[in-house]
């Protein structure tokens, strides 16, 4: 036998008869205040205009309601939520790998790549990899990462200074706000 879940009244939007306050402040369709009325009086005004009485703020004293078309109001709220989600950007961590013996042109390519990532609002993890006995030259790798940090100064700031991680040395740069 299927179970029918009953929606709690709190989850439902407070419109028309669902507004349960002794007195409410009512705003007309054009934004002018009609004053403090009982929900029954306000509902009667809304029905005369063939519109709904929508609770905007129950935190105010007295609660604020507006006479409007609820379908239109709901659509606008959903549209605003969609726009907000669209504008949200999660900062990813993009990695730029190189060796400490990198040639000048290759280095410039990596800097341009990191610059593009920072402009897009992503963090950049600059990694210098070591092979075999190259790990003895960690000071050169640190100098390279510091040089990269100064080259990217206008676009980002060092979030984590150069440090060794196993056979790599890495540094984290976050975009400037």
Swiss-Prot record:
It is found in: Cytoplasm. Keywords: Cytoplasm, Initiation factor, Protein biosynthesis. PROSITE patterns: IF3 (PS00938). One of its GO terms (cellular component) is membrane. InterPro entries: T_IF-3_C_sf, T_IF-3_N_sf, Translation_initiation_fac3_CS, Translation_initiation_fac_3, Translation_initiation_fac_3_C, Translation_initiation_fac_3_N. GO terms for biological process: ribosome disassembly. Disulfide bonds: none annotated. GO terms for molecular function: ribosome binding; translation initiation factor activity. The keyword Protein biosynthesis applies. Monomer. Belongs to the IF-3 family. IF-3 binds to the 30S ribosomal subunit and shifts the equilibrium between 70S ribosomes and their 50S and 30S subunits in favor of the free subunits, thus enhancing the availability of 30S subunits on which protein synthesis initiation begins. This is Translation initiation factor IF-3.
């Amino acid at each position: 036998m299927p179970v029918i879940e009953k929606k709690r009244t709190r989850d439902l939007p407070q419109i028309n008869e669902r507004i349960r306050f002794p007195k409410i402040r009512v705003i007309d369709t054009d934004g002018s205040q009609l004053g403090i009325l009982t929900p029954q009086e306000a509902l009667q005004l809304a029905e005369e205009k063939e519109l709904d009485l929508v609770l905007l703020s129950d935190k105010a004293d007295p609660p604020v309601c507006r006479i409007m078309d609820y379908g239109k109001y709901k659509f606008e709220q959903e549209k605003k939520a969609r726009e907000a989600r669209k504008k949200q950007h999660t900062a990813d961590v993009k990695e730029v790998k190189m060796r400490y013996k990198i040639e000048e042109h290759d280095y410039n390519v990596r800097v341009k790549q990191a610059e593009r990532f920072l402009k897009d609002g992503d963090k950049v993890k600059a990694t210098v990899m070591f092979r075999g006995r190259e790990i003895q030259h960690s000071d050169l790798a640190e100098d390279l990462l510091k040089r990269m940090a100064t080259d990217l100064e206008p676009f980002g700031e060092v979030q984590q200074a150069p440090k060794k991680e196993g056979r790599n040395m890495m540094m984290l740069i976050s975009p400037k706000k």
